[in-house]
Amino acid sequence: MKFKEIFKGNNSAYGIMQLTGETTEKGKAVAKAFIKRETITDKLWQEHIDGKEPALGVIPINEDNQCRWGCIDIDVYNVDHLVLMRSIKGLGFPLVTFRSKSGGAHLFLFSKEDIPASLM
């Protein structure tokens, strides 16, 4: 599974998040998050890709304090994702933009090889 390679991270734990259906005054979707001290299975990956809850949260830093990707979480819930993507492209930043479940944005940076987490 290609997603599994792209989002390679910690093999001994992962996060899960379940939306409650509520929102804050600022418009953020409310969720409950937990850490599971287990290996991520192919079934969990597939369910995440299929959009089933709970959402899967890969921990990017592996057991050797290295990572292949990082993510900036933007907690602005009325952000215009198209404007954000154009701004990032205009600045020449190598970031990939996704809408987060809460309505904000996640900006991902990827590396072809493991690098020290402190550099990411």
Predicted regions and their residues:
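Broad hydrophobic/π-residue packing in well-ordered secondary structure
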Residues: 13, 105-109
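Active-site-proximal helix/loop segments of hydrolytic enzymes
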Residues: 72
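Anionic group-transfer/hydrolysis microenvironments
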Residues: 75
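Helical (often loop-to-helix) elements that flank the catalytic cores of nucleotide-handling enzymes
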Residues: 80-90, 110-120
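A short linear hydrophobic-aromatic micro-motif
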Residues: 92-98
